[in-house]
C-alpha cells in the first residue's frame, strides 16, 4: 500500500510506526505519481481490561502423564518401589544383564528386532476425585502389552494413534473415585524400551510434587498459568471465550503477555486476526455495537 510520505527540503520523509520484528521494503517512484496514504490504528474503540474467570474450550482431551511406576521382572514376587520410567528401563536391563540405554545407543532398527528374553511388569497407582467413564490409555507397543485395570483385563485393540505414529490409544474401563491400579506387562529384551504412558479424557488434573490426581474438569478458567488450573500436562490448543461489549463499531484486542506460538482471535466465530508480533494487536471494524463473544485461541 502507498506509504505516508512527504517532501521536505528536497528529501522524501516516510512516517511509519515500527515495532519489534518489523521490516519494510519501499519502492520509490516518480514524484506525485502515488498519493500519500496514512494508515493508523484506531484507538477510539474504548478500553477495558479483561479479568476473572471465563468459559473455555479444549481442542483435544486433557492428559494425565504416568511416568513413574513400581516394577518387577517376570518371576519376581514383589514389586520394587516407584521409580521414574527411564531409570526403570535401565534397572530392568541390569537385572537381565542387558546393556543400558543411553544417549548414544544405536537405534533398535539398525540391527533388527531381537526376541524378548523376559517380561517387565509395571504397576501404576491412579488417584481420582471423581468416577469417570470414557478414559483412553495411550502407550507404545499397545498390541504387545498385557493390560489390566483394577484387576480387569483391558482389550488392547488400537483405536487410533496419539501424537506420534508409535503411540496408540486403547479404551480403559471406568475410573473409580479413589485409588485405581493399572498394570502393564511388556515383553522385554535388548530391543525393548519402557516409555511413559498417558491417560486421556475430559477431566482435570492436579499435581503436588510427584503426586497427580484426576479431578472434575474446571467449569471456567482464568488468565495465566494453566498448569495450576487443571491442565499440568495438556499440550493442545485452548480457546478462551470472553463476553465483550462493543462500542463505536470497532474492537481492538491487545494481548502482549502470553506463552505460545500465537493467539488466534475471533469474534462470534469469525476470525479477526492472529496475534504473534508487536504491537500484539487484532482489530475488528464495522461491527454492530452491543454484546459479542471474543474467542482467543492459544
Region roles according to the model:
Residues 2, 18-19, 225-226, 233, ...:
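Non-catalytic C-terminal accessory modules of carbohydrate-active enzymes
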Residues 118-135, 172-175, 240-251, 284-287:
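Extracellular and analogous surface-interaction loops
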Residues 126-150, 182, 244-269, 294-296:
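Aromatic-lined ligand-binding clefts that engage carbohydrates, nucleic acids, or primary amines
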Residues 3-7, 34, 47, 55-56:
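Short, exposed beta-strand/loop patches in secreted or surface proteins that constitute
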Residues 1-14, 142-143, 147-168, 264-282:
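Solvent-exposed beta-strand/loop surfaces of large extracellular or lumenal domains
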Residues 43-119, 141, 160-165, 170-243, ...:
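An acidic-aromatic loop/edge-strand motif
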Residues 1, 23-29, 121-123, 136-138, ...:
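Ordered hydrophobic segments in well-structured contexts
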Residues 10-38:
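C-terminal beta-strand-rich structural cap/linker in extracellular carbohydrate-active enzymes
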